[in-house]
Amino acid sequence: MDQSFFHEIVWSRFIRFPYGHLLDYAGENGEAIYPTKDECEKSMPNPRSWGLPIENGAFFTGLYVYALLEEYRKHRSPKTAEEIDILIKGLYLLQDVAKVEGFIARGVGEDGRSHYPMGAECQNFPWILALYSYYKSDLCTDHAGVKERLLRVLLALRKYEWKIPCDVEGLFYKSSWLKANDWRGVVMLLFCTRLIYELTENKEELDLFQEYMSSVPTAGVFKRKEIVSQGYSHDMVTSFGNQTWICLYTHLAVKELLKLDPNHEAEYKLCLYTNGVTALKNINSIKKYDNEGGGFDINWHSLNALWKDYENDTSTGTAIAEKQFSFWHENLVPHRKMEHSVLGNALFAAWAAVTSEDERISKKAMEIFKEEITRINWNSLHLSYAFVAESVLIFDE
């Protein structure tokens, strides 16, 4: 199973045309059920679009763009350039449909514009990472336009004190990165602050970045640069279990900070190494994967029976989504736990390992990866994680 094998699966089943978004899941022939305009406007089944194929449009498309840009850098294929263009336009759309500046939609409904009101940092941040990586590449022919898009989002987030806006004026998702003392929150604050400097070349922005690096966040113990160096294992213990997928985009941001900020090379390299060590432990979960063990019904509409009006309250909206998510897993997609928590966790861990800047970690990770992927029935897999497997092979090359 080489890179082209996974690439074909991704583009034949999981890229949504004409919008250029990578789906969360699809049927074996690429079929998916999209919400209507009415369902989006009523936030049915929930305002976070959990359980829908468009749930992670900005997240997964952003990560995939990042990987394909690496593929293009290595091989300069016109086909890869065309694919990146399709996905970049998809990311543009997720910004263009917003009413509130700084909001990035998760995906769009069947009309190509309707969307759910609650975003998340796991959508905004991969979007930012992808667009900045594209901006730096020689594929970008509209630097002024891409810079303007990035700064619109970055400056809006700073205006909101680094909180993620919903597409409802005055409504925000979770707390501020400015107050965060967790690894992910700190990395996101530092990366975005540094990007504002890189895009504006305003020395005051660089001074602010240095100030953030050297200061202790509210209720924290360590300076932010120390928190960065500690890696994501602490976040896993306190918040996410062993799930690497939610930490991968911030890990990649540290890889970018290593290029942008040589003054803190030691902290960034220690972070990447530490993450690689943690990832190496998590890759072994792939050995527990079972191709059988439950179905995956792509028709999510029965979740609408559990719908309630979230009344523009993000806590209520999340509670509704969580209740539906449990029902979805138990009754509609029992195999998703195996696909996501077992296989997905291992694949994202492999991606972290091959970008750890440590040859020993990368080599061992790929030994496990290449040995185990051949027994996975990829054609019956409903989650779009073939894109992660492809990305691992791109960065290992």
Language model: regions and residue ranges:
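Low-complexity, Ser/Thr/Pro/Gly-enriched N-terminal "stalk/linker" regions
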Residues: 1-59, 85-86, 90-107, 141-168, ...
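Elongated scaffolding segments in large macromolecular assemblies
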Residues: 142-291
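Short glycine/serine- and small hydrophobic-enriched flexible loop segments
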Residues: 65-74, 129-136, 194-198, 252-259
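Terminal, non-catalytic domain-edge segments
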Residues: 1-17, 137-141, 148, 244-397
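TPR repeat positional signature
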Residues: 60-61, 68, 131, 186-189, ...
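Carbohydrate-binding/catalytic loop surfaces
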Residues: 19-53, 100-120, 166-188, 226-259, ...
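Non-membrane alpha-helical segments in proteins
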Residues: 53-73, 86, 109, 113, ...
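Aromatic-rich surface patch/π-platform used for binding flat ligands and interfaces
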Residues: 95-103, 121-126, 130
